[in-house]
Amino acid sequence: MQMKYLIPIFFLVLIVADHCHAFLGMIPGLIGGLISAFKGRRKRDITSQIEQYRNLQKREAELEDILANLPVY
């Protein structure tokens, strides 16, 4: 084979090997995520989300009050 054909093939094999290596490294994390999803460990608690939203609204209102009381230069 000529060199102009070997170099692209080499880079193609290098890229494919890199992607396969990255995929193999992700498999344990994916399996763990699936197991925890099926067991229901990561269920979201809606009450905590509501409290976070209320706290965010309260902080936004306080910030608006502070900015309204600042003198304009």
Swiss-Prot record:
Q: Which residues form the propeptide?
A: 45-73
The Gene Ontology biological process terms listed for this entry are: defense response to bacterium; defense response to fungus; killing of cells of another organism
What is the annotated localization of this protein? Secreted
> What GO cellular component entries does it have?
extracellular region
Report the domain of life of the source organism.
Eukaryota
So which tissues is this one expressed in? Expressed by the venom gland.
Q: What is its main location?
A: secreted
Signal sequence coordinates: 1-22
Q: Does the keyword Glycosyltransferase apply?
A: no
User: Keywords for this entry?
Assistant: Antibiotic, Antimicrobial, Cleavage on pair of basic residues, Fungicide, Secreted, Signal
Biological function: Antimicrobial peptide. Has a high antibacterial activity against the Gram-positive bacterium S.aureus (MIC=5-17.30 uM), the methicillin-resistant S.aureus (MRSA) (MIC=17.30 uM), and E.faecalis (MIC=69.23 uM). Has antifungal activity against Candida spp. and one Cryptococcus neoformans strains with MICs values ranging from 6.25 to 100 uM. Also shows an inhibitory activity on C.albicans biofilms at high concentrations. Has a moderate hemolytic potency (18% at 20 uM). Also inhibits the growth of the five cancer cell lines tested.
Q: What else is known?
A: The primary structure of the mature peptide is identical to that of NDBP4.23 from Tityus serrulatus (AC S6D3A7).
Homology family: Belongs to the non-disulfide-bridged peptide (NDBP) superfamily. Short antimicrobial peptide (group 4) family.
| Official protein name in the record | Putative antimicrobial peptide clone 4
